[in-house]
Amino acid sequence: MSEKQVALYIAVSLDGYIADENGSVEWLESIDSEGDAGYEAFFDNVDTVVMGRTTYQQIFSLTDTFPYSKKDVYVFSNTKAGTKDEYANFVAGTVDTWLNNIDGEKIWLVGGAKLVQQFLKEKAIDRFVITIAPIVLGNGIPLFEEDREHALELEEVTRFGQFAQLTYKNLEEN
């Protein structure tokens, strides 16, 4: 079996927020982009999708069709752990334990911020693909809350219309 790879693929405002103070990401739709900012190519390369419960619930308010139905989907949730629904398996516990118990090898960490912090604390993110939107929100839900440093190496910078996508490799080992 090859080594599992976890990628955080996410959009942020220029000031580092992944959502506004109400948890909405509608501000992303108002910005001109060039194509899908590499999303389809990224998505085609993952076999597993993981997110927090709030992010999972928000998806259903944004679309009528669940966009990840062809992938293995896991949702971290303390209240629903051990259950599943039509689209996802609900899990709890440590990231490391979860990673050791899944078959997937190319994993997309969708978010939200709390789950990102958990993955960061366990040094479980291998690659950061951060797409920066040309907007300053002023406040909202920050991508990073932890005050600990993380050593990263810039691998690529790509422009998609008004968006800048930065890809970093995590230099810290789990």
What role is predicted for each listed range?
Residues M1-N174:
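Enzymes that bind and transform nitrogen-containing heteroaromatic metabolites
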